[in-house]
């Protein structure tokens, strides 16, 4: 098999399959991982989706330890440590207390 280089991979071209505009910064589920919209992506249009990097994201209640695997819960639109019914998001690069509203997540 021959592999042909396409792009560095920190961001990918993503076609919005929905009838709604994806907002810049919005989390997008890719089934087994997440991406973050780098720009607004209108319905059926192609836009930039970050798939590597560190992002500050809203989190569910509860503490998150440094290094913990974290997941994106689409129904709450928050990061959690609960894998059930959620999409793998990455890992916490810093601890977050229960009362913290956000957590820093390394995706990709």
Set out the residue ranges of the language-model regions.
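Surface-exposed, low-hydrophobicity beta-strand/loop segments enriched in small/polar/acidic residues
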Residues: 1-108
């Amino acid at each position: 098999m021959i592999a042909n280089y396409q792009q560095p991979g920190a961001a990918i071209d993503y076609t919005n399959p929905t009838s709604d505009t994806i907002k810049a910064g919005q989390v997008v589920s890719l089934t087994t991982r997440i991406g973050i919209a780098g720009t607004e992506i209108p319905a059926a249009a192609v836009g930039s989706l970050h798939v590597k990097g560190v992002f500050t994201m809203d989190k569910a209640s509860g503490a998150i330890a440094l290094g913990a695997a974290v997941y994106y819960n689409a129904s709450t639109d928050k990061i959690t440590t609960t894998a059930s019914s959620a999409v793998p998001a990455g890992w916490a690069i810093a601890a977050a207390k229960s009362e913290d509203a956000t957590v820093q997540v390394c995706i990709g």
